[in-house]
A protein has these predicted regions:
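Post-cleavage N-terminal segment of exported redox proteins
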Residues: 1-59, 80, 190-199
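Surface beta-strand/loop "capping" patches
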Residues: 54, 59-60, 65, 112-131, ...
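Feature representing long, continuous alpha-helical segments
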Residues: 31, 62, 72-75, 85, ...
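Gly/Gly-Pro-rich "capping" loops immediately C-terminal to redox-active cysteine motifs
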Residues: 83-108, 121-165
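Sequence/structural segment immediately N-terminal to covalent heme-attachment motifs in c-type
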Residues: 58-80
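Sec/Tat-exported extracytoplasmic proteins
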Residues: 71-72, 78, 107-111, 179, ...
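C-terminal capping alpha-helices of c-type cytochrome domains
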Residues: 32, 36-40, 129-131, 135-141, ...
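Small beta-barrel nucleic-acid-binding modules, principally OB-folds
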Residues: 31-53, 102-125
Length: 199
């Protein structure tokens, strides 16, 4: 927190520690974190409840499933059991991989922990065209980039003037602006139900 106060911390790192520091059990430290690293604002323009408060909320998985496919726009980039678009990781079994706290952190701060092979790259072509997305595949001669709209774009490597990996996730970091705290709780509750099918 001292580094934050002195403005000596990278924005990506600050985002990564915001939720954990707001959730610490020591009141003085949590209050200081709330001042220096406030939680994002929700769809009703109110500060989001603390992570501890969100974890205590009861979610409705059925409503969460509807939100996942509509208002939350999650299905625009994630596949669940064959439904949705494959831009980000497949979430069909995410409930067996992440607990509720980690799910909240992944939604609120997607850049804090980007899954391997889902790093965002910015590609600048010699024509001046700029394309941002995830590397879908590459050969010695060609590179295929999948953009946030799930469209694939393939270029000859000889056309690429510059390519840089970004520290920012392609996933929007402001989903809480379209989801209320209860909506978030519902989506997380739905995600916890996504587990491998019994054999």
């Amino acid at each position: 927190l001292k580094l934050v106060e002195e403005k000596r911390i990278e924005p990506d790192l600050a985002a990564a520690v915001t939720v954990p520091l707001n959730a610490v059990p020591w009141r003085d430290l949590a209050n200081q974190a709330a001042t220096l690293l406030p939680l994002p604002v929700s769809s009703d323009d109110q500060p989001l409840p603390s992570l501890g408060s969100l974890l205590k909320m009861r979610g409705n998985a059925a409503n969460g499933q509807k939100l996942f496919a509509s208002t939350g726009t999650c299905a625009n980039c994630h596949v669940v059991r064959g439904q949705g678009k494959e831009v980000g990781p497949d979430l069909s079994e995410i409930g067996a991989k992440l607990g509720r706290e980690a799910l909240y952190e992944s939604i609120l701060y997607p850049s804090a922990g980007i899954s391997h092979n889902y790093e965002t790259h910015v590609v600048i072509l010699d024509s001046g065209t700029v394309v941002t997305g995830i590397i879908a595949s590459q050969t010695d001669d060609e590179l295929s980039i999948k953009a946030a709209d799930a469209l694939m774009r393939t270029f000859k490597k000889s056309e690429i003037e510059q390519m840089e990996k970004q520290n920012v996730s392609i996933m929007p970091a402001d989903l809480q602006k379209v989801l209320s705290p209860q909506d978030l709780a519902d989506v997380v509750e739905y995600l916890t139900t996504l587990r491998p099918s019994p054999k």
